[in-house]
Every structure is written in C-alpha cells, then in structure tokens.
C-alpha cells in the first residue's frame, strides 16, 4: 500500500445492511455487517497521495479510506482484524468503490450502472486535469433513501479491509486499503 500523504473528509456514506469496498462487482464481494444500530450515515475519510507517471502531471490517488462509526475511545479499545480474511482482485480497474450493499449501482433497480461509471470517469478525469487534491466521485444511486456510492481513483490492483470490533461483534470502525499483491 502506498502511504497516504494527506487525509480529507470526503463526505458521508449512507449505511444500510452491509458496507463493501467492492462495489460494482458481480461476484467475489466481501461485505461488513454488524454495524452500530442508530447511525444511518458515517463520515468517510480518504488518504490521498500524489502519483506521477513519466512527464505527466501528478494526480491524486487514494490508498486508504476510513469510516469511523463510533467515538475515538471505543475505536481505540476495539480489536482490529482483517475484515475480508484475504484479498480479492478489484472489480474495476483503476477505481475502488465504497457503498452500502443495497446502494451499489449494480443492485439498484432501474439504474444504468455503466452510465454511472462513465460519469465517475468524467468527474475524476476533470479533477485530474485540475490537479484536485481531493479527487473522487459520489453518485447518488437511490435518491429516495439517500443511498450513495463513493468512487476513488486508485493505482493498485487489490482491495482489502479491516474491522474494529467490540466484544459483542459490533463494528465501530472500518478501514479499507488498495494495494498491489507482492509476487
């Protein structure tokens, strides 16, 4: 994983059922259930770094995303584990997708997920062209329930996630990374 050079709050994620870092995947999805009851949204913090290829201008890429679901004291006291119990290849080359499972563009009836992806690519390409430090795209997939999906530009091919769990199994924080599998 490339170490983030800065973090920024990028907004909120609508919580429902499970949260996944593998949005837009038709198979091989991992999800995090057991979320705190009560909050319907969680703040999302993304760790960015500058990435440069050759003589091209540097662009902001994401290597880590954190969703704190409780106060810091509860998160510090929790046990952390590998929430996915292994790795999976990314569903989308060049992007990581964070969403509540029912708000994944592929799972919302009547949505054109490919049109959503084209819009995401347009937004992120525009941000690259502007040298935007906090470059990501949010797509509202279910306006009636406020459901959304957050798309992050990544260079790495793999995705993984970690959970901070209380003794009763309640998830109080999620952390997600993008990385390259060492061969």
Segments and roles (model prediction):
Residues 1-183:
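Intrinsically disordered, low-complexity acidic regions enriched in Pro/Ser/Thr
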């Amino acid at each position: 994983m490339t170490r983030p050079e800065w973090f920024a709050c990028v907004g909120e994620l609508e919580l429902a059922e499970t949260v996944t870092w593998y949005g837009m995947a038709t198979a091989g999805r991992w999800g995090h259930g057991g979320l705190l009851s009560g909050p319907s949204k969680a703040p999302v913090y993304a760790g960015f770094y500058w990435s440069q290829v050759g003589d091209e201008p540097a662009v902001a890429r994401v290597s880590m995303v954190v969703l704190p679901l409780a106060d810091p004291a509860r998160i510090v006291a929790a046990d952390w584990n590998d929430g996915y119990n292994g790795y999976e290849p990314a569903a989308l080359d060049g992007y990581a997708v964070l969403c509540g499972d029912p708000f994944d563009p592929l799972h919302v009836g009547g949505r054109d997920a490919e049109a959503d992806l084209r819009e995401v690519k347009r937004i992120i390409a525009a941000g690259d062209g502007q040298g935007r430090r906090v470059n990501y795209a949010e797509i509202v997939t279910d306006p009636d329930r406020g459901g959304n999906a957050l798309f992050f530009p990544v260079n790495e091919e793999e995705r993984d996630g970690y959970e901070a769990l209380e003794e009763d199994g309640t998830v109080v924080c999620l952390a997600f990374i993008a990385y390259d599998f060492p061969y």
